[in-house]
Amino acid sequence: MLSTQFNRDNQYQAITKPSLLAGCIALALLPSAAFAAPATEETVIVEGSATAPDDGENDYSVTSTSAGTKMQMTQRDIPQSVTIVSQQRMEDQQLQTLGEVMENTLGISKSQADSDRALYYSRGFQIDNYMVDGIPTYFESRWNLGDALSDMALFERVEVVRGATGLMTGTGNPSAAINMVRKHATSREFKGDVSAEYGSWNKERYVADLQSPLTEDGKIRARIVGGYQNNDSWLDRYNSEKTFFSGIVDADLGDLTTLSAGYEYQRIDVNSPTWGGLPRWNTDGSSNSYDRARSTAPDWAYNDKEINKVFMTLKQQFADTWQATLNATHSEVEFDSKMMYVDAYVNKADGMLVGPYSNYGPGFDYVGGTGWNSGKRKVDALDLFADGSYELFGRQHNLMFGGSYSKQNNRYFSSWANIFPDEIGSFYNFNGNFPQTDWSPQSLAQDDTTHMKSLYAATRVTLADPLHLILGARYTNWRVDTLTYSMEKNHTTPYAGLVFDINDNWSTYASYTSIFQPQNDRDSSGKYLAPITGNNYELGLKSDWMNSRLTTTLAIFRIEQDNVAQSTGTPIPGSNGETAYKAVDGTVSKGVEFELNGAITDNWQLTFGATRYIAEDNEGNAVNPNLPRTTVKMFTSYRLPVMPELTVGGGVNWQNRVYTDTVTPYGTFRAEQGSYALVDLFTRYQVTKNFSLQGNVNNLFDKTYDTNVEGSIVYGTPRNFSITGTYQF
């Protein structure tokens, strides 16, 4: 098989050696792969910049990335576990939101709070760092601003770095950092595609992606991506309408200078969303089960979100091998919602609801509530850094250094009212026909501003031809001002990684970084928990083949933390349902991950991964047992050599048993979801050179499963279908 190799000197070199690993996998898993087109003796040289993000538009892998260190490298050179979800995989698997991407990414698990809110975890800890083009946004789970609903039509790929990522983000849990890479205007000719999709629950989706030069020489280019989606749901009364748009201009201002500037808009309007799930427990300790269509949302409930972002990137090359990059962004995310939740136990005799605080006395027998919440999150961020190579002791090395500043303001308002048993009546007869609250004026619920200033640097030193050392550090000044208190912290996060090249295809690595994470969680008295501190260690083995078209990673990790927030399962007294947490010291998460991703042959793409970890506190108690300790995820596509117009594929996601023990007035109950697998299928037929039809089936066997054993019952998505027509020009 012909390919090129991205080497350690940031150059592309032609190679004609076939991939032994790819051949072995192909022969073992699919004998027909042996009949793929044979290699020829002709050498093909691919010219391109070392910063080219992708060497195959139809691959599940990419050639190089700056994830983890901001230095452009192959994944094999990064001493951490990295997963990249490419545009082709998102199209094959119909991963249309950030949440859907994370659900199908190795090592990431989900806890679904209701119809639209979900928390995502890796290695046992919540993911709280979400970046766009390397600029982070921090969000709180209490407020639903639609982060996981970001539409992937606007993005080229998603990069996931697992473990602590303090060198990139300054603060954060040792879970993972998610970076969404925007689409850019890369074509000097007019090109594009339009698609229409129709599916289960009256889904309709239309997307256009167009590129065009704005000048005759193509040095100024534009790209517009726009779309509209409307769908109902398996949940009664639910409807979602989404509009999204991105416009970007990329300009070559000279031979050494490029400028990108753009605007992003997303609007998501949801009618009758749920706020929490269905009551799990009866008063006798038995658990409930419901039809998956059952919803606690009344007809008048809604949750509307609007996202506006402007952004720019300026790049300047200098001194032959150096480049300075300035990223800037301003984003505003607004939401407005009126919803209803039920938090109660069911009396099996008559279906009447009993509140969790009924034994506190009169006035405490409420069984839920209604809330009118609104607010805005504003983020202003700048990031300036330079990276390049230098020579020392006769060897080439790499250096990156820079600084960043971000200001994030969260300002939210709320009005709420309690619901009492007689207002609902028997829950067995509840159908969402509930009168809208006579709302009181909203009051200020939260107003806080977080400032973060950082200086960072890292160098990749070639100690010997096969041995590379990465050293780095990030100094962070973090300050938050809230309605009730102010806090300022200074922290330096060290980073060290060692990579040893075993041969042309295999490397082994070790890495270390510290952990620093201020927390927004509060204890039962309403006080904020102290920052999380700790250490992250990782050892691994990586390989890449065919110019990184196929990559593998085997990683062993150990995470040590103090002051980790763990849910108590009860709300903070006097709060609007906010869960109380306790700080747990001596928390250790340790485990192993394996991933294979990319092209097995020119016709066969495969991503396969498995994760196993254990997370315990210093007393041996499981931390977050509501998260699966073992997961396996696989997705593949295969283009038939005998009928190259036809591509078939599918995948499976499996997780082991999860549970949560909940203390109630009636005793301690255990909520449990056994292990289960979800199977998906897809096929695509290239009808003409420009037009294709694709069909997808998700949850093929219509598995019923609970996505949130930590709280009320929230069922996962039932079996669903879609068909998509795409025209390229």
Swiss-Prot record:
Effect of substituting Y341A: Minor effect on growth, reduced growth, and no growth on solid agar with Fe-coprogen, Fe-rhodotorulic acid, and ferrioxamine B as the sole iron source, respectively
Effect of D343A: Minor effect on growth, minor effect on growth, and no growth on solid agar with Fe-coprogen, Fe-rhodotorulic acid, and ferrioxamine B as the sole iron source, respectively
Binding site for Fe(III)-coprogen: R117, R142, W275, Y357, N373, W416
TBDR beta-barrel domain ranges (all copies): 189-729
Span list, region Disordered: 48-72
Outcome reported for the amino acid change (mutating S337A): Minor effect on growth, minor effect on growth, and no growth on solid agar with Fe-coprogen, Fe-rhodotorulic acid, and ferrioxamine B as the sole iron source, respectively
Function: Involved in the active transport across the outer membrane of iron complexed with linear hydroxamate siderophores coprogen, rhodotorulic acid and ferrioxamine B. Binds Fe-coprogen with high affinity, rhodotorulic acid to a lesser extent, and weakly to ferrioxamine B. Selective for planar siderophores. Does not use cyclic siderophores ferrichrome nor ferrioxamine E as substrates.
Protein's name in the database: Hydroxamate siderophore receptor FhuE
